[in-house]
Amino acid sequence: METIFDYNQIKQIIPHRQPFLLIDKVVEYEEGQRCVAIKQVSGNEPFFQGHFPEYAVMPGVLITEALAQTGAVAILNSEENKGKIALFAGIDKCRFKRQVVPGDTLTLEVEITKIKGPIGKGNAKATVDGQLACSCELTFAIQDVK
């Protein structure tokens, strides 16, 4: 897959930083509509120290956060939203179907389905080797950084 935005370019679009920046590169992008990102899950991730030391599994809330960051790239790279922030406003119909473990390549796909004013919605899914790991509907609010 061709890289559309690399790690450093992602940091120019969304405000997240280590250890909370959870996407490594963007491989598909349609401004304001769709984004596909990749997260290479390493055994060195700080969350694996406690989740769980003897059975490392990526926390589901961090998978949903990685999906939200992917959606934020789709929204915040547009000229009208540059410099703004996208905040979680809701997560619906969230399901976890497969554990994500060190060594996995997590593919994160978000399709923006609706934007009305500062509020938007998107359908999101995370897969590993084509197997569904997580799916959900995201609601977000776009606002200026104060």
UniProtKB/Swiss-Prot annotation:
Recorded superkingdom: Bacteria
Protein localization: Cytoplasm
EC number: 4.2.1.59
Keyword annotations: Cytoplasm, Lipid A biosynthesis, Lipid biosynthesis, Lipid metabolism, Lyase
Molecular-function GO terms, alphabetical: (3R)-hydroxyacyl-[acyl-carrier-protein] dehydratase activity
Keyword Lipid biosynthesis: yes
GO (cellular component) term, any one: cytoplasm
Active site: 51
InterPro entries found in the cross-reference section: FabA_FabZ, FabZ, HotDog_dom_sf
GO biological process: fatty acid biosynthetic process; lipid A biosynthetic process
PANTHER family noted in UniProt: 3-HYDROXYACYL-[ACYL-CARRIER-PROTEIN] DEHYDRATASE (PTHR30272:SF1)
Protein name, UniProt field: 3-hydroxyacyl-[acyl-carrier-protein] dehydratase FabZ
Upper lineage: Bacteria, Bacillati, Bacillota, Bacilli, Bacillales
Gene that this sequence comes from: fabZ
